[in-house]
Design a protein with these regions (language model features):
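Expand to "…catalyze enediolate/carbanion chemistry for C-C bond making/breaking, isomerization
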Residues: 1-172
Length: 172
Protein backbone atom coordinates (compact mmCIF):
# COMPACT_ATOMS: atom_id res chain seq x y z
CA UNK A 1 0.00 0.00 0.00
CA UNK A 2 1.32 3.46 -0.86
CA UNK A 3 0.93 6.61 1.19
CA UNK A 4 -1.58 9.23 0.13
CA UNK A 5 -0.23 12.69 -0.60
CA UNK A 6 -1.47 16.22 0.11
CA UNK A 7 -0.21 19.10 -2.03
CA UNK A 8 -0.24 22.62 -0.64
CA UNK A 9 -1.24 25.49 -2.93
CA UNK A 10 0.37 28.60 -1.50
CA UNK A 11 1.39 30.90 -4.37
CA UNK A 12 -0.10 32.64 -7.38
CA UNK A 13 1.92 30.30 -9.63
CA UNK A 14 0.62 27.26 -7.75
CA UNK A 15 -2.95 28.48 -8.06
CA UNK A 16 -2.49 29.06 -11.80
CA UNK A 17 -1.28 25.44 -12.14
CA UNK A 18 -3.77 23.93 -9.67
CA UNK A 19 -5.42 21.60 -12.21
CA UNK A 20 -2.05 20.29 -13.39
CA UNK A 21 -0.96 19.78 -9.77
CA UNK A 22 -4.25 18.00 -8.99
CA UNK A 23 -3.60 15.55 -11.83
CA UNK A 24 0.10 15.01 -11.03
CA UNK A 25 -0.25 11.60 -9.35
CA UNK A 26 -3.04 9.18 -8.45
CA UNK A 27 -1.59 9.14 -4.92
CA UNK A 28 -2.81 12.72 -4.39
CA UNK A 29 -5.75 12.68 -1.97
CA UNK A 30 -6.16 16.38 -1.18
CA UNK A 31 -5.09 19.93 -1.86
CA UNK A 32 -4.46 22.24 1.08
CA UNK A 33 -4.70 26.02 0.91
CA UNK A 34 -1.68 27.92 2.24
CA UNK A 35 -3.19 31.26 3.32
CA UNK A 36 -0.14 32.96 4.84
CA UNK A 37 2.15 32.24 1.90
CA UNK A 38 -0.59 33.08 -0.63
CA UNK A 39 -1.27 36.40 1.11
CA UNK A 40 2.44 37.21 1.14
CA UNK A 41 2.73 36.31 -2.55
CA UNK A 42 -0.26 38.50 -3.46
CA UNK A 43 0.61 41.34 -1.08
CA UNK A 44 -2.76 40.75 0.60
CA UNK A 45 -3.98 40.40 4.16
CA UNK A 46 -4.62 36.91 5.57
CA UNK A 47 -8.25 37.83 6.35
CA UNK A 48 -11.03 35.83 4.67
CA UNK A 49 -12.17 38.33 2.01
CA UNK A 50 -8.80 39.07 0.34
CA UNK A 51 -8.20 35.33 -0.13
CA UNK A 52 -11.74 34.29 -1.08
CA UNK A 53 -10.95 33.97 -4.79
CA UNK A 54 -7.91 31.77 -4.10
CA UNK A 55 -9.87 29.57 -1.70
CA UNK A 56 -12.75 29.26 -4.17
CA UNK A 57 -10.40 28.35 -7.03
CA UNK A 58 -8.80 25.61 -4.91
CA UNK A 59 -12.19 24.16 -3.90
CA UNK A 60 -13.33 24.16 -7.54
CA UNK A 61 -10.12 22.40 -8.63
CA UNK A 62 -10.67 19.77 -5.95
CA UNK A 63 -14.24 19.24 -7.16
CA UNK A 64 -13.04 18.81 -10.76
CA UNK A 65 -10.39 16.29 -9.66
CA UNK A 66 -12.40 14.56 -6.93
CA UNK A 67 -9.88 15.52 -4.24
CA UNK A 68 -10.50 16.69 -0.70
CA UNK A 69 -10.07 20.42 -0.12
CA UNK A 70 -8.30 21.36 3.13
CA UNK A 71 -8.42 24.97 4.31
CA UNK A 72 -5.54 26.80 5.95
CA UNK A 73 -5.46 27.13 9.73
CA UNK A 74 -6.93 30.09 11.58
CA UNK A 75 -3.94 32.03 12.84
CA UNK A 76 -5.26 33.97 15.89
CA UNK A 77 -5.00 31.39 18.67
CA UNK A 78 -6.76 33.71 21.14
CA UNK A 79 -9.91 34.27 19.04
CA UNK A 80 -12.19 31.26 19.52
CA UNK A 81 -15.17 33.11 18.06
CA UNK A 82 -13.18 34.05 14.98
CA UNK A 83 -12.11 30.42 14.54
CA UNK A 84 -15.72 29.20 14.72
CA UNK A 85 -16.83 31.83 12.20
CA UNK A 86 -14.00 31.01 9.80
CA UNK A 87 -14.45 27.24 9.92
CA UNK A 88 -18.18 27.77 9.24
CA UNK A 89 -17.20 29.81 6.16
CA UNK A 90 -14.80 27.05 5.12
CA UNK A 91 -17.56 24.45 5.31
CA UNK A 92 -19.98 26.72 3.43
CA UNK A 93 -17.40 27.20 0.66
CA UNK A 94 -16.92 23.45 0.23
CA UNK A 95 -13.80 22.61 2.21
CA UNK A 96 -13.81 19.06 3.60
CA UNK A 97 -11.27 19.83 6.34
CA UNK A 98 -9.45 22.67 8.08
CA UNK A 99 -5.90 22.52 9.30
CA UNK A 100 -5.31 23.14 13.01
CA UNK A 101 -2.12 24.65 14.40
CA UNK A 102 -3.06 24.32 18.08
CA UNK A 103 -4.91 21.64 20.07
CA UNK A 104 -7.63 24.15 21.04
CA UNK A 105 -8.63 24.38 17.36
CA UNK A 106 -9.40 20.68 16.94
CA UNK A 107 -12.76 20.68 18.76
CA UNK A 108 -14.26 23.67 16.93
CA UNK A 109 -12.99 22.35 13.59
CA UNK A 110 -14.48 18.90 14.22
CA UNK A 111 -17.79 20.37 15.39
CA UNK A 112 -18.19 22.48 12.26
CA UNK A 113 -17.07 19.75 9.86
CA UNK A 114 -19.10 16.88 11.36
CA UNK A 115 -22.65 16.48 10.03
CA UNK A 116 -25.25 16.85 12.79
CA UNK A 117 -28.04 14.34 13.40
CA UNK A 118 -30.42 16.87 11.84
CA UNK A 119 -28.25 17.25 8.71
CA UNK A 120 -28.03 13.46 8.36
CA UNK A 121 -31.81 13.04 8.74
CA UNK A 122 -32.44 15.79 6.20
CA UNK A 123 -29.98 14.23 3.75
CA UNK A 124 -31.77 10.89 4.05
CA UNK A 125 -35.15 12.57 3.49
CA UNK A 126 -33.78 14.39 0.44
CA UNK A 127 -32.53 11.15 -1.09
CA UNK A 128 -35.84 9.41 -0.40
CA UNK A 129 -37.75 12.26 -2.05
CA UNK A 130 -35.30 12.44 -4.96
CA UNK A 131 -35.83 8.73 -5.66
CA UNK A 132 -39.45 9.64 -6.51
CA UNK A 133 -38.34 12.37 -8.94
CA UNK A 134 -38.26 16.12 -8.38
CA UNK A 135 -40.00 17.02 -5.13
CA UNK A 136 -39.62 18.97 -1.89
CA UNK A 137 -38.35 18.45 1.66
CA UNK A 138 -39.28 20.97 4.35
CA UNK A 139 -40.69 23.22 1.63
CA UNK A 140 -37.42 23.29 -0.33
CA UNK A 141 -37.10 21.93 -3.85
CA UNK A 142 -35.23 18.65 -4.27
CA UNK A 143 -33.52 17.78 -7.54
CA UNK A 144 -30.37 15.91 -8.53
CA UNK A 145 -28.04 18.77 -7.52
CA UNK A 146 -29.55 18.86 -4.02
CA UNK A 147 -29.37 15.05 -3.89
CA UNK A 148 -25.65 15.15 -4.74
CA UNK A 149 -25.03 17.42 -1.77
CA UNK A 150 -27.09 15.09 0.44
CA UNK A 151 -24.99 12.13 -0.72
CA UNK A 152 -21.87 14.07 0.25
CA UNK A 153 -23.25 14.72 3.75
CA UNK A 154 -23.97 11.01 4.18
CA UNK A 155 -20.56 10.00 2.80
CA UNK A 156 -18.83 12.28 5.30
CA UNK A 157 -20.98 10.93 8.13
CA UNK A 158 -20.33 7.33 7.09
CA UNK A 159 -16.57 7.94 6.89
CA UNK A 160 -16.44 9.68 10.26
CA UNK A 161 -18.78 7.46 12.23
CA UNK A 162 -17.53 4.15 10.85
CA UNK A 163 -14.09 4.95 12.32
CA UNK A 164 -15.13 5.80 15.86
CA UNK A 165 -15.28 3.50 18.85
CA UNK A 166 -16.79 6.31 20.90
CA UNK A 167 -20.32 5.29 21.89
CA UNK A 168 -21.54 8.89 21.88
CA UNK A 169 -19.51 10.01 18.86
CA UNK A 170 -22.03 9.19 16.15
CA UNK A 171 -25.41 10.73 15.53
CA UNK A 172 -28.16 8.17 14.96
Amino acid sequence: KTAALVAQIESAHGLAAVDEIAAATPRLAALMFGAADMAADLGADTAWEPLLYSRSALVAACARSQLLAIDAPFFDLRDGGGLKAEVARSVALGFAAKCAVHPTQIGPNNSALTPTSQAIAEARAILAENAKGVGAVNGRMVDEAIARKARRVLAVADALFSRTDDADGAPP
